[in-house]
Amino acid sequence: MVLMGPHSALRLLPLKTQAIRFVLLLLLSVLILAVALLVTNARMPDPKVVRPLPDIGFEVFPKVGWLEHLTDVCIFILNFLSLLVVFKLYLLHRQNEGLDELQPFSCCPLIGKIIFGVWDSGRQSGIEKRDAHLIAWIRYFTTYFIVLLFRAIVVVMTSYPATDNHCQNPMKITNPVKNVIMTLVTFGSGSIHCGDLMFSGHTVSITLSLLVQWIYGSMLHWVFRPASVLLVLLSFYSIIASRSHYTDDILVSFYITVTTFLVLRHSPDGAPWQLQLLIGWWPCCVSNEETEDSDRNPTFVAVEVFLPHGDYQCAERISEEKTTVGPACGNFGHW
């Protein structure tokens, strides 16, 4: 008997389609959050009346205002490393599929080897190399848009007193539309917003980069794990020391992001079918049908069928298109 899941009758979207459409869904969640920030900025308690909340992190680490810029630098480096991991996973995928190595810098082999060289740590992570770059990308953006939507609700519900930073003298938003656009374009760094404390948006981005480098970066090189941990710790210190967020903002954000990312497990189908329903009806932004892909070679798939008398029959077939019937048992235990 073959177990049939609720998604077995659904046509799952190609990974490349998911990779593009979930980016657009993230932008939509940023737009919703930008509107929510207008509300939080207006509802924030008057700093002249309500002082910052007691915080052990503030008591342990002295205030160093300029460290707010160091936080941005750390986030930039972490994001760059995450992009590097995804690109190197793509090169590893190509090697695993038996495709030729990319050699765009034939005139300078050293540069070509550094940029387009294949990295493989040899670590047995239980994650297949095939399409790992697309799946990592999809997990990143699906987690990001879910957490930001949740944050848009949370920051509106309860207004916390401003921390001891520039929000003690908050700027007034004179042009809400412009502020929303600046939030969307700069992901918040170029817009006016105070009061969006519970929970930290900076920490969402930082934690996602940590997860990508811890889980997928370790498939490429051992250095990604210690490097990302050091950058994350430095980022958290900078956020607290610059008084950008309360310590609880960081702890709650870290927990929510990690939990969401781990729930959205690594799957050869990409995002869970429930999330694919959000983008499966779109008439634009890449086809809903799997097309012939030069990065794919025919593979043998073993299908185990339970017969009435307890015997087992194993059939092999060549498949150019992946379909999943029932739960993907091989994914249990993967990060």
UniProtKB/Swiss-Prot annotation:
EC number(s) recorded for this UniProt protein: 2.7.8.-
Extracellular compartment segments: 43-72, 120-139, 201-203
Membrane topology reported for the UniProt record: Multi-pass membrane protein
Pfam families named in the record: PAP2_C (PF14360)
Top EC class of this enzyme: transferase
Domain of life the protein comes from: Eukaryota
Chain segments annotated as transmembrane: 22-42, 73-93, 99-119, 140-160, 180-200, 204-224
Keywords: Kinase, Lipid metabolism, Membrane, Sphingolipid metabolism, Transferase, Transmembrane, Transmembrane helix
InterPro entries for this protein: Sphingomyelin_synth-like, Sphingomyelin_synth-like_dom
Active site, UniProt feature: H202, H245, D249
Name of this protein: Phosphatidylinositol:ceramide inositolphosphotransferase
Organism: Trypanosoma cruzi (strain CL Brener)
Lineage: Eukaryota, Discoba, Euglenozoa, Kinetoplastea, Metakinetoplastina
